[in-house]
């Protein structure tokens, strides 16, 4: 996990990038009251980060959950640090030491390569669940910058803690669009190579031209599109910390479900409307699903395929949940489920 140490390495990289002025960090940072250094020792997961360092935005798509282990140092004046994280497809381990100060909860780290000393503060922690660190540094290119990091004893934290972290970060001048959550790719062993992702082929029907308002709502499908490839992925909130309601295709339930999108990055399994999601990702297997109105109380007339009757029928959709057996016109239902005897041409099947 990107540790205090990895954080400091990240901050030092700001020296190599030129950008505009950044907000000035506060002069006086308050540490956790009655800080107990022995209780901060042990393993932590770095789950979120925010920074005024301009370079940070350039690598946000590559930042993943990392681990940090803190412990007693080689001398009474130090604490030891070991961080483990994925970097460029390889599991990397970094070790170092932090210097204690006269203020409990404040530590110094010297980066000899850049000849700078960084100040790190433990500003909030309950020791058993979470910890928030702030780190200040000064570079000749950007002047003073500040970085906030959220750590957890487990790979997941309560949503309220993520919200509290965002408030703390913004309170020291970090812009909202510079606060990110980390993608969790799991823990790794130093030297381990990250496996290549495996895409599972799926089968769906070709669609009618746009003017026919077919299942795809677009041109005749003759090749696999990047968006359709993404239908096999799980949803991704992305590293930013916004809360925008979006839809993703759940291949297990064969339905489009809602999730909270952070506002940046993520992946292609991300749709503004349920209709767009279904018309992009639904497969012919949806025609065999039961007709489900859903628990909400709206009254929306949609079409579904009745497998018993062998035809498309109207049904009142409640407005939420349901499943993929849900079409926005009779023509869409018929062309998708291949209703015989309608004079329609047989629809082609293909796999990606």
Curated annotation (Swiss-Prot):
Glycans are attached at residues 24, 36, 115, 215, 250. The precursor is proteolytically processed into separately functioning proteins. It is an enzyme of class 1 (oxidoreductase). The record marks 241-242 as: Inhibitory (P1) (chymotrypsin, elastase). It comes from Homo sapiens (Human). In vitro, the first twelve residues of the amino end of the inhibitor appear to have a reactive site capable of inhibiting the activity of a number of enzymes. Its in vivo function is not known. This is Protein AMBP. The reductase activity toward cytochrome c increases at alkaline pH 8-9 when compared to pH 6-7. GO terms for molecular function: calcium channel inhibitor activity; calcium oxalate binding; carbohydrate binding; heme binding; IgA binding; oxidoreductase activity; protein homodimerization activity; serine-type endopeptidase inhibitor activity. The lineage of its organism: Eukaryota, Metazoa, Chordata, Craniata, Vertebrata.
């Amino acid at each position: 996990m990107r540790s205090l140490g990895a954080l400091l390495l990240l901050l030092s990289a700001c020296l190599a990038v030129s950008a505009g002025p950044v907000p000035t960090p506060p002069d006086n940072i308050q540490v956790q009251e009655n800080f107990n250094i022995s209780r901060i020792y042990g393993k932590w997961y770095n789950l979120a980060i925010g920074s005024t360092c301009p370079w940070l935005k350039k690598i946000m798509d590559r930042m993943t959950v990392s681990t940090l282990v803190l412990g007693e140092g080689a001398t009474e004046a130090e604490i030891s640090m070991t961080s483990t994280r994925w970097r460029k497809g390889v599991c990397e381990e970094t070790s170092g030491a932090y210097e204690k100060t006269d203020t409990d909860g404040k530590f110094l780290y010297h980066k000899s390569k850049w000849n700078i000393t960084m100040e790190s503060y433990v500003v909030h922690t309950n020791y058993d669940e979470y910890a928030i660190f702030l780190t200040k540094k000064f570079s000749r290119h950007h002047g003073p910058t500040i970085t906030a990091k959220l750590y957890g004893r487990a790979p997941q934290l309560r949503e309220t803690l993520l919200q509290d972290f965002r408030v703390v970060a913004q309170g020291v001048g970090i812009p909202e669009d510079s606060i990110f959550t980390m993608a969790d790719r799991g823990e790794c062993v130093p030297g381990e190579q990250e496996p290549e992702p495996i895409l599972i082929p799926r089968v769906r029907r070709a669609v009618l031209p746009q003017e026919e308002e077919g299942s795809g709502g677009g041109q005749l499908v003759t090749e696999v599109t990047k968006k359709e490839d993404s239908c096999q992925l799980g949803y991704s909130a992305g590293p930013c910390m916004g809360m925008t309601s979006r839809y993703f295709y759940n291949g297990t339930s064969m339905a489009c479900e809602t999730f909270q999108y952070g506002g940046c990055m993520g992946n292609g399994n991300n749709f503004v409307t349920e209709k767009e999601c279904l018309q992009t990702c639904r497969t012919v297997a949806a025609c065999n699903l039961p007709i489900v109105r859903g628990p909400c109380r709206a009254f929306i007339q949609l079409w579904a395929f009745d497998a018993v009757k062998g035809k498309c029928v109207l049904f009142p959709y409640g407005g939420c949940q349901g499943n993929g057996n849900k079409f926005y016109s009779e023509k869409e239902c018929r062309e998708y489920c291949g209703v015989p005897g309608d004079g329609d041409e047989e629809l082609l099947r293909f796999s990606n």
